[in-house]
């Protein structure tokens, strides 16, 4: 596979994040009655929306917000888990081709979404198109203090609701909203501070405003910040189990606590490897919640 083909098909969509978006979709389907044929179609649609959103975000962060533009230390840094943010700056892809890439993923996602709308109900179409719009809100959210909220909305409520409405025309959506919180916490409220840590100096010079960047700017301990959100997520998970939304078996995710702690211990000395390990633990966390609930 050529460099450009790999960039378009593998790197821009950021498939490593598929579990972070896919797990809440599956949980939504389970809460709405269980996985069915339309649930799997909904999962496919959700992942295609994710791919398009990631691709368009790369173009927007270069051409619109300018965060990925400039020299090596003046733009977003490459991470151990993704290098897609620098494909345009390095001249591997053009801005136009990245826009086209993102729109093609969205066009592909529209096919299963329309099918689900005709088969299950039109609510899934509304949720799906709302998910597509998130990437444009997210690009500017980094400049108006809604950074975590916008991404949290995408990987939390919208993802869970998409799984629900792909499964049933009248799902228990209130339970879905409550169940979506841990997914929003791990990927957005905790994850963004980690993801933006190496970008903070360059992006703050361009005017970004979000809590994730302030963690770095104000010298707040990243380890303390991450562990605080993790502790809240685990406590909230206990709440969901107690009120009967999650099955007690979903507590298998607690087994990952030592891995989170271990990765944070090495953040100061081996940031790139440790951050990759934290992301891997976060991916396992959302998978364990869903698997535990499904098998319980």
Walk through the language-model features, giving the residues of each.
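Small-residue-rich segments of transmembrane alpha-helices in multi-pass membrane proteins
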Residues: 19-28, 150-165, 213-217, 275-293
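Intramembrane alpha-helical segments
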Residues: 86-170
């Amino acid at each position: 596979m050529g460099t450009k083909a790999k960039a378009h098909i593998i790197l821009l969509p950021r498939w490593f994040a598929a579990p972070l978006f896919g797990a809440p979709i599956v949980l939504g389907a389970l809460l709405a009655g269980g996985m069915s044929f339309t649930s799997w179609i909904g999962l496919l649609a959700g992942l295609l929306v994710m791919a398009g959103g990631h691709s368009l975000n790369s173009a927007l962060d270069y051409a619109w917000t300018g965060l990925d533009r400039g020299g090596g230390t003046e733009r977003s840094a490459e991470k151990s888990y993704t290098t897609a943010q620098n494909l345009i700056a390095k001249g591997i892809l053009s801005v136009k081709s990245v826009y086209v890439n993102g729109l093609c993923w969205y066009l592909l996602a529209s096919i299963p979404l329309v099918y689900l709308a005709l088969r299950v109900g039109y609510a899934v179409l509304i949720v799906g198109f709302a998910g597509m719009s998130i990437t444009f809100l997210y690009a500017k959210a980094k400049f108006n203090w809604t950074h975590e909220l916008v991404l949290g909305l995408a990987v939390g409520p919208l993802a869970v609701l998409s799984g629900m409405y792909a499964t049933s025309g009248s799902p228990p959506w209130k339970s879905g909203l409550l169940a979506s919180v841990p997914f929003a916490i791990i990927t957005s409220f905790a994850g963004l501070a980690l993801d933006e840590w190496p970008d903070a100096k360059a992006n703050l010079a361009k005017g970004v405003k979000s809590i994730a960047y302030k963690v770095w700017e104000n010298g707040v301990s990243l380890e303390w910040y991450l562990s605080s959100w993790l502790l809240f997520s685990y406590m909230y998970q206990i709440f969901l189990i107690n009120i009967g939304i999650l099955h007690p078996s979903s507590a298998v995710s607690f087994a990952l606590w030592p891995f989170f702690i271990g990765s944070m211990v090495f953040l100061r000395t081996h940031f790139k490897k440790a951050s990759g390990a934290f992301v891997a633990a976060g991916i396992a966390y959302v998978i364990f919640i869903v698997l535990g609930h499904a098998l319980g």
